[in-house]
Amino acid sequence: MIKTNIKISFGELRDLYVNLLAVANKKLPIRLSHVISKNMQLISEEVHLIDDCRIKMAENYADKDENGEPKFNDNKYIISDENAMKFNAELNEYYSTTTEIDIYKTSSNELNKLEEQRYDGLSPSEIGALMIILDEESDTN
């Protein structure tokens, strides 16, 4: 396992967390499971801050009731079409903000172990999502 520093946008970081969460409960080789868990711990606080800011933006653009509180429908903010365009533009700009974070990587050889019956398989999209935490040049012990 190698710790490395990368530049990543807020949107990519949020997507990485969602992708790691999606495979975290699968039966995977222990080194791969470990690096997934370590990365989830490393980035979870930052992702929660990103989501808190997204929620504040949504509250700002949401239609308000007579008390000035955001309106909801099915646990979603009600946002007018005009404000939705502004919200999406601001959110996209926010998600493009770049940050530096440390992540852990493991050998891409760990994927070869997925062929064993005792492990769950991963779809091509799941493997693609994990590429950022795989190091093709190392053979970690």
PLM features: what roles do these ranges have?
Residues K3-D63:
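N-terminal interaction modules that seed assembly of large macromolecular complexes
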